[in-house]
């Protein structure tokens, strides 16, 4: 799910163009907060999900983002903020790297489009291992670059959505999706960052 804005729009457009053949659900959301909520819902149902937004959108989604980092994820969830250093096509600059530090979640910063593909794949795997969202940060020059990317094998299995919510309250796999007490979650987040 995503919200349009340079330099992030092309990602959702590209995913939408292959959505039928790859069995992907892709949407333009009402705003960035809704996009993050839609992606989180997919993750809570044990599906991989991607939230695409520009730097201003991270601020729009920040209320939910703060809770999401505290409650954790189930299926791999990558949040892909596309930033515009120097405000080449935006009215201001933003830097989502501060959210990674504040929320104590992993941040990956690719330097070219092959790394962007590889790190996004790794971001999903890391998210599934750590049970938290992973930021994969892009910038204008990367978002608007083009070239050859080696995909490798694409997944062929069809994952089915499943949602459990009747387990132990602090069990991230079967319990309700809630933010646990801050002190408890803060310690867990620090362990996840060390593990990453």
Where are these regions (language model features)?
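Flexible, low-complexity linker and terminal segments
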Residues: 110-196
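Thiamine diphosphate
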Residues: 1-113, 118-120, 139-143, 155-156
């Amino acid at each position: 799910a995503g919200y349009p804005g340079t330099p992030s729009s092309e990602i959702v457009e590209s995913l939408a163009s292959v959505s039928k053949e790859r069995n992907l659900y892709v949407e333009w959301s009402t705003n960035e907060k809704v996009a993050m909520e839609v992606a989180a819902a997919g993750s809570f149902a044990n599906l991989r999900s991607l939230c695409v937004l520009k730097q201003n959108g991270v601020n729009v989604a920040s209320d939910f983002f703060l809770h999401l980092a505290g409650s954790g994820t189930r299926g791999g969830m990558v949040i892909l903020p596309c930033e515009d250093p120097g405000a080449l096509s935006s009215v201001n600059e933003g830097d989502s790297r501060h959210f990674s530090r504040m929320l104590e979640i992993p941040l990956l910063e690719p330097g070219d489009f092959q790394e962007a593909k590889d790190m996004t794949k790794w971001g999903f795997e890391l998210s599934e291992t750590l049970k938290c969202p992973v930021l994969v940060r892009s910038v204008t020059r990367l978002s608007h670059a083009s070239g050859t990317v080696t995909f490798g094998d694409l997944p062929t299995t069809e994952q089915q959505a499943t949602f459990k919510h009747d387990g132990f309250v602090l069990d991230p796999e079967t319990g309700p999706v809630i933010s646990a007490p801050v002190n408890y979650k803060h310690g867990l987040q620090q362990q996840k960052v060390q593990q990453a």
